[in-house]
Amino acid sequence: MSYDEKSQKTLAVVKAMEEALGANSNSMDKHFHKDFRWMGNQGCGTKNNLEEFRNNWQLPLRAAFTDRIYKPDRFLVDGEWASCFGHIDAVHSGEFMGIKPTNKRVKIHYTDFWEVRDGLIIDNWVNVDFPSILAQLGVDVFNGQGWEAFDRGEAEPPKPN
């Protein structure tokens, strides 16, 4: 198999999994290797198998956010690796990080990096923009100290000595 063919096969595996997530599939095992690992940023945690992924990520996300529309913006592939950045449009209809449901529509920005082995996803490194979600729900995790204030001209950025 050529490198380009391998890349296209990897992309097909990842897109099929993304479609299954978007369709609320409960049969995700056909997309993941038996040794699957899901490694998220702070607040997301690490899931060491498909059962942990389902119980500690997929179902809590469904409980907190309904009317989800998955919108992958771009896929990049390189052999057995694929990456995607995008967002999920959703309604905050269940408790999230201690915040009671607000029924606000939010954007959940994410970036994923997947490794595909033998036609199955074995590793998934994930970054979900929790500070942005929380800000949309009225919680400023930076307590007014976010560097966006520099961009808006509201604060002077520090300079190195």
Residue ranges and their predicted role:
Residues G22, A90-H92, V116:
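Beta-strand elements of well-folded, non-transmembrane domains
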Residues N26-W81, H87-D89:
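A solvent-exposed, acidic/Ser-Thr-rich amphipathic alpha-helical stretch
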Residues Q42-G45, V91-H109:
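A cross-kingdom feature marking solvent-exposed beta-strand/loop segments within repeated
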Residues T10-E18, W38, W57-L61, A82, ...:
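Short, structured motif recognition centered on aromatic/hydrophobic residues
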Residues W125-L134:
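Short, solvent-exposed aromatic-acidic interface loops
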Residues K71-F75, H109-W114:
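Hydrophobic/aromatic beta-strand elements that line small-molecule binding cavities or substrate pockets
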Residues I99-P101, L134-V139:
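A short acidic/glycine-rich loop-to-helix N-cap element
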Residues M1-K30, K34, G144, A149-N161:
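Short, low-complexity N-terminal intrinsically disordered segments enriched in polar/charged residues
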